[in-house]
Amino acid sequence: MQIITAEDYRLYGGLKRPELESGVEVMITAANALITSLLGMDDADAVDQLITTKPTRKKYFLSSPSATSVTKMTINDKEIDPEQYKLYSDGVILLKFNPPEGYMDVEYTQGGFNPMPEDLKLAACMLVDHWHKQDYRQARTIGGETVTFNNTKSGIPEHIRTIIEVYRRV
């Protein structure tokens, strides 16, 4: 999923030149891939998900909150008419009947964020900046003095990870 483009990073950094420093384009691609992975999303458009059904439940959750449409739904090998359920924009399916106990197979298409949240774009830009400035180093020498500091476990600074966690899918 493309979270930021080179143009977004230029805007974030206030850069006037059309070209970026070497390696920044690769860092942008890597930041997009890493954040997409941390969000629990993938780039596949078509998804097939198996969900356990209970007769007392009518509300079910898809693993992707960006589901745009259900292409096919079956419960215990019986196809369900689209009039019998509703897909909400946050990936929730509400059935209009009590399903039998068993399994619901949902085939759906997913999209990304539309539009991309500005704070998520900011997190991606800050991550590229973090890598570009090599802020991940454990020690720095400033004015003859060496300062040592702890790295984060994930390699992503806490303030960036906090933004990503808001949109993370479990």
UniProtKB/Swiss-Prot annotation:
Q: What main location does UniProt list? A: virion
Q: Which UniProt keywords apply?
A: Late protein, Viral capsid assembly, Viral release from host cell, Virion
Q: Which InterPro entries match?
A: HCP
Q: Is Transmembrane helix tagged as a keyword?
A: no
Q: Which domain of life is it from?
A: Viruses
Cellular localisation: Virion
| Biological processes per GO annotation | viral capsid assembly
One Pfam family, short name? HCP
GO CC terms in record:
virion component
Does this entry carry the keyword Ion transport?
A: no
Q: What does this protein do?
A: Head completion protein that closes the capsid once the viral DNA has been packaged. Probably part of the head-tail connector by binding to the portal protein and to the tail completion protein.
The identity of this protein, by name, is Head completion protein
- Organism (species): Escherichia phage T5
Q: State the organism's lineage.
A: Viruses, Duplodnaviria, Heunggongvirae, Uroviricota, Caudoviricetes
